[in-house]
């Protein structure tokens, strides 16, 4: 297995290439697989990401830091990084796993990425692993808003409305469709002050509410700036000095 291209993409060259090979080996392939390295890499990754967030976002509290970290190290995030590194091309899978498309499976790719982090840690220590993690994550962090990352649509809508002193939205189930085992819920979300009324659907009430909240948030974010602009214009008009009307009696005296 030629791993030069992968090491180039990682920006790290192993002094013990067998560690990288083991990190890419699924348990379906051989007894010398990557699960122990994955365990180690998971801990190293969490520590390095926590350290990075602590240094980058000095104004975030403990709860927000935990939320952001959880979203950066969850399976989907790791899977996307693994895809960027093209790990599916170099995974070592057993024949059955290979035939079933294991090289595309998010869990397998995410685990392999954690195992690579563990392998780098064993190969050269924590600083080398932290350098790799920073290289992988800094481009991601430059594109996300840590204040909203990981928050669902209902939470974002509620926080946005509260920030502008607007009453919270109202959610109502207006219809359900389908058999009991495959129901679809339809929910309306209303923000009366802004005359917003949208509808969302989902396989559960919660999912439908989230879908409706996302649509409502899009509408609210368009309307609130217009409302604020109009409010400022009205305040400016009221405070602008009005011309003093002429005194009719003074006009008569001047004519005399």
UniProtKB/Swiss-Prot annotation:
What are the EC numbers? 3.1.26.3
Listed A to Z, the keywords are:
Cytoplasm, Endonuclease, Hydrolase, Magnesium, Metal-binding, mRNA processing, Nuclease, RNA-binding, rRNA processing, rRNA-binding, tRNA processing
**Is RNA-binding one of the keywords UniProt gives this record?**
yes
- For whether the record's keyword set contains Ligase, the answer is no
User: Which InterPro entries has this protein been placed in?
Assistant: dsRBD_dom (IPR014720), RNase_III (IPR011907), RNase_III_dom (IPR000999), RNase_III_sf (IPR036389)
Tell me the ranges covered by the RNase III domain, including all copies: 3-125
Q: Active site annotated at which positions?
A: 42, 114
* GO cellular component term, pick one: cytoplasm
Positions of the region Disordered? 229-256
Amino acids binding Mg(2+): 38, 111, 114
- For this entry, list what GO says about its biological process: mRNA processing; regulation of gene expression; rRNA processing; tRNA processing
Which reaction does this enzyme catalyse, per its entry? Endonucleolytic cleavage to 5'-phosphomonoester
Q: What task does this protein carry out? A: Digests double-stranded RNA. Involved in the processing of primary rRNA transcript to yield the immediate precursors to the large and small rRNAs (23S and 16S). Processes some mRNAs, and tRNAs when they are encoded in the rRNA operon. Processes pre-crRNA and tracrRNA of type II CRISPR loci if present in the organism.
Q: What is this protein called?
A: Ribonuclease 3
Organism expressing this protein natively:
Cupriavidus pinatubonensis (strain JMP 134 / LMG 1197)
Gene encoding the protein = rnc
């Amino acid at each position: 297995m030629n791993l030069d291209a992968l090491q180039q993409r990682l920006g790290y060259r192993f002094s013990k290439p067998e560690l990288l090979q083991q990190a890419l080996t699924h348990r379906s392939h051989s007894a010398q697989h990557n699960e122990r390295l994955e365990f180690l890499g998971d801990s190293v990754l969490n520590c390095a990401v926590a350290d990075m967030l602590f240094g980058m976002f000095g104004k975030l509290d403990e709860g927000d830091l935990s939320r952001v970290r959880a979203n950066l190290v969850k399976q989907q995030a790791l899977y996307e990084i693994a895809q960027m590194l093209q790990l599916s091309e170099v995974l070592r899978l057993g024949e059955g796993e290979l035939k079933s498309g294991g090289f595309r499976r998010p869990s397998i790719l995410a685990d392999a990425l954690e195992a690579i982090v563990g392998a780098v840690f064993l190969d050269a220590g924590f600083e080398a692993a932290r350098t790799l993690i920073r290289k992988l994550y800094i481009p991601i962090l430059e594109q996300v808003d840590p204040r909203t990352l990981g928050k669902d649509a209902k939470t974002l809508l509620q926080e946005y409305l509260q920030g502008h002193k607007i009453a919270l939205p109202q959610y109502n189930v207006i219809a359900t469709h389908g058999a009991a085992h495959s129901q679809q819920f339809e929910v309306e979300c209303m923000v009366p002050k802004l005359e917003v009324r949208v509808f969302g659907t989902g396989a559960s009430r919660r999912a439908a509410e989230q879908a409706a909240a996302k649509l409502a948030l899009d509408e609210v974010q368009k309307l609130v700036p217009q409302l604020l602009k109009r409010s400022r214009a009205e305040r400016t008009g009221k405070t602008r000095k009005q011309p003093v009307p002429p005194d009719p009696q003074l006009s008569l005296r001047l004519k005399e």
